[in-house]
């Protein structure tokens, strides 16, 4: 699982999800990438599930890059707990994804297989996304 080794503060505020990504919007390492089209929190489990889906489809001969890291804790209070008495304990680690951000990159010789693998990964993520290549990017 992807979680930070050490954090300065155990709990954080929840940022507003607005604006578009300023960095990480191009495919830099591989030939194909998954680009987000909307705002979302993506958890460490969803990232891992998408990575496994890609690796199982391409088997061998390709390389996958994960360009996002869940560095923000989300808290939750226990069930049937009254309001008040402080903030809940950290439950998940998430990354705040903005539109235009490239989440995964893939290098693979066959374009059809690469697109099929990335499509499977998109189905594991809680956002609308599209497949971009190194040539066609916005």
From Swiss-Prot:
Segments of skewed composition (Basic residues): 1-17
Gene Ontology terms, MF aspect: rRNA binding; structural constituent of ribosome; tRNA binding
UniProt KW keywords: Ribonucleoprotein, Ribosomal protein, RNA-binding, rRNA-binding, tRNA-binding
InterPro entries according to UniProt: Ribosomal_uL16, Ribosomal_uL16_bact-type, Ribosomal_uL16_CS, Ribosomal_uL16_dom, Ribosomal_uL16_sf
Gene Ontology biological-process annotations: translation
Gene Ontology, cellular component aspect: cytosolic large ribosomal subunit
Region (Disordered): 1-22
NCBIfam families linked: rplP_bact
PANTHER family found in the cross-reference section: 50S/60S RIBOSOMAL PROTEIN L16, LARGE RIBOSOMAL SUBUNIT PROTEIN UL16M
Purpose of the protein: Binds 23S rRNA and is also seen to make contacts with the A and possibly P site tRNAs.
Family to which the UniProt record says this protein belongs: Belongs to the universal ribosomal protein uL16 family.
Assembly information from the UniProt record: Part of the 50S ribosomal subunit.
Protein name, as recorded: Large ribosomal subunit protein uL16
Gene: rplP
């Amino acid at each position: 699982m992807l979680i930070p080794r050490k954090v300065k503060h155990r709990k954080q505020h929840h940022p507003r999800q607005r604006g578009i990504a300023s960095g990480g919007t191009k495919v830099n390492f591989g030939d194909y990438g998954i680009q987000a089209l909307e705002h979302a929190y993506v958890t460490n489990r969803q990232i891992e599930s998408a990575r496994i889906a890609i690796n199982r489809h391409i088997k061998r001969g390709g390389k996958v890059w994960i360009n996002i890291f869940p560095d923000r804790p989300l808290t939750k209070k226990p069930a049937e707990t009254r309001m008040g008495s402080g903030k809940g304990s950290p439950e998940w680690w998430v990354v705040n994804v903005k539109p235009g951000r490239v989440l995964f990159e893939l290098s693979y010789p066959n374009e059809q297989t690469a697109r099929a693998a990335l499509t499977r990964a998109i189905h594991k993520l809680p956002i609308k996304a599209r497949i971009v290549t190194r040539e066609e990017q916005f």
